[in-house]
Amino acid sequence: MARYVLVILFLTTECFVENRTINYCAADVSPKTHRHKLHPSATMPSSDPENPSRPRLEASPELMEELAAASELLEKANPIEVIRWASERFKKRLTMATAFGPEGCLILHWLSSVAPDTFVFNLETGYQFKETLELRDRIRDRYGITVSYESPETTVEEYERRHGGPLYRTDPATCCGDRKIVVIERVLSNFDAWMSGIRRDQSPDRADAPIVGWDKKFGVVKISPLANWTKSQVWDLILQENVPYNPLHDKGYVSIGCWPCTRAITDGEDERAGRWSGSEKTECGLHLRD
């Protein structure tokens, strides 16, 4: 159930979730820009501290109904409200994955004001650009959020030795599966919900992404605060708020992943054309449509 009351410049939204009332006040999507104190590094919970025996969420009809209602309500909310809802709803059972793309950096900009103790992680495959890895330190210095590197069990050297060379050249799907999917499955097993920076206009696989929905692949709730935003909206606010971003974006790299499978694109090419160029592969498997 939702009720909207417009008072001067503020929109108050009242929604009922799990018999709790959550109020939002929306004014500006831009929190004050300032340097935040360094927060204690968020740790990955092995269980709910308030209820150690608490099981993970199940895709019950009641939960599906709740998520659908929340997604419909938050479709017209600004991203800060979405993040606030997610933090209030899932608390320590909420995490965020980021590849330090522009959308992820913008969400971190907001997260530092709304829920700075959220556990944030990056899938460190061993093949990321040095510019991407250096951005982690800039994010930490600016916002006080230390992004945790989550890596595969085998190093790049061990992995390539096991497969007789770089697997990304011959079987990029398996490489992504081993060095990304297996890792995120391990991380998300400790949480009930995760946030991502995907946008609907990035690719056909993402075109139907809800603001809030059930992620069948990983068995958790998935929140995408920027699902209904455009590339220009993201970059306008990044430049306006001086949000740190990967300098490779200034060199024609629009979508940035592992260096062996990423190239700069030219005018007129699809936003993700620089990923796995020359193959039919367009996604690593994290955000494939059900």
Give residue ranges: language-model regions:
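Nucleotide-activated chemistry modules centered on ATP-dependent adenylation/adenylyltransferase
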Residues: L6, F10-L11, C15, R35-D290
